[in-house]
């Protein structure tokens, strides 16, 4: 989804944003990942978007952001944000231009207003935020590497996330698990360009993002514990998914080597687990089939009882058992069930009638 989507301006929405390097032929060095994160922070400050979490990989990045309610941004705040984005010297130059323009009276004041409005239109908009991030980083990357042209895929991905703790935490954990899945780190907090590592270091933006996701009632230690548990759960699911794929490939006769998340011992354990799951599914299916069969048989017998009572109203369980060839106790249970459903009525002397 591109930055033309109207949801990009819908206030109080949470977005999972992803963008990849075009053709995945370039890989970001460590210093370039640092530069990208710095641009992300500056763009978020300028646009008013709140960073909840991030992870910058070698050829793509993930961001979890909150688009807050738009607020009125005065001249001083516009200049402050512009300084964050462009540098303090650029902001001072603009402020100096304002002074010169205003000497021209109303026409100059109108020019100031137009400039301020042009900056305000770039704020509180996910599309504008992503445009700044991608465009600014491309310019820096091209300058540093002697490259020209586009760096990113044309369209970034924007997936809406329910603004609810569990959904946001699951998305954030998915983002933080990227380095483990890619074998770029061997611990959840061991990847420097992840907001989880920043949270563990006490980074203010990362801590505030985790607090928004988990709730202000939790301490940092409690958030750390809850997030670690969620990451462990997701990692286990990922390992099982990869094990299932390897086992399917091997069963089909293909050479399927292990990856960094699996071992032969884990594959054997996973195979036993999958077989247990398969057997349990078969057992439940058989139970359901038996239950459905029993239900169908009961329906048939109920119809036969109704037919018998139509021919001979007032028959009791013994009379009906002789007609149907069933045990008296079975017929009586059927009659009681039918009475509860309102299909038959029970007389004072033990007989039954169709309702």
Where are each of the predicted segments found?
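Proline- and acidic/polar-enriched loop/turn elements at helix boundaries
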Residues: 56, 187, 333, 350-351
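Residues within the helices of the helix-turn-helix
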Residues: 307, 318, 336
């Amino acid at each position: 989804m591109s930055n033309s989507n109207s949801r990009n301006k819908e206030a109080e929405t949470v977005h999972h944003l992803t963008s990849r390097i075009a053709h995945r032929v370039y890989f970001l060095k460590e210093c370039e990942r640092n530069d990208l994160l710095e641009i992300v922070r500056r763009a978020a400050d300028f646009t008013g978007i709140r960073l909840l979490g991030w992870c910058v990989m070698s050829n793509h990045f993930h961001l979890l952001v909150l688009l807050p309610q738009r607020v009125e941004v005065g001249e001083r705040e516009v200049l402050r944000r512009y300084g964050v984005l462009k540098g303090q010297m650029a902001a001072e130059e603009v402020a100096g231009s304002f002074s010169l323009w205003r000497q021209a009276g109303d026409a100059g004041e109108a020019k100031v207003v137009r400039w301020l409005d042009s900056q305000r239109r770039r704020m509180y908009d996910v599309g504008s935020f992503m445009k700044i991030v991608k465009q600014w980083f491309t310019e820096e990357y091209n300058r540093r590497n002697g490259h020209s042209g586009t760096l990113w895929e044309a369209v970034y991905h924007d997936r809406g996330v329910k603004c609810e703790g569990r959904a946001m935490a699951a998305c954030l954990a998915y983002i933080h698990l990227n380095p483990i899945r890619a074998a770029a780190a061997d611990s959840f907090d061991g990847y420097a360009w992840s907001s989880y590592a920043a949270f563990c270091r006490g980074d203010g933006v990362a801590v505030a993002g985790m607090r928004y996701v988990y709730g202000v009632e939790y301490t940092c230690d409690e958030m750390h514990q809850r997030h670690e548990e969620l990451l462990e759960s997701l990692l286990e699911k990922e390992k099982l998914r990869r094990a299932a794929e390897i086992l399917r490939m091997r069963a089909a006769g293909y050479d399927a080597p292990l990856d960094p998340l699996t071992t032969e011992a884990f594959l054997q354990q996973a195979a036993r687990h999958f077989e247990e799951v398969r057997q349990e599914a078969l057992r439940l299916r058989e139970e359901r089939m038996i239950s459905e069969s029993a239900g169908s048989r009961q329906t048939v017998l109920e119809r036969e009882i109704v037919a018998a009572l139509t021919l001979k109203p007032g028959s009791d369980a013994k009379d009906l058992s002789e007609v149907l060839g069933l045990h008296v106790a079975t017929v009586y249970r059927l009659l009681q069930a039918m009475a509860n459903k309102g299909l038959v009525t029970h007389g004072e002397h033990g007989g039954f009638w169709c309702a």
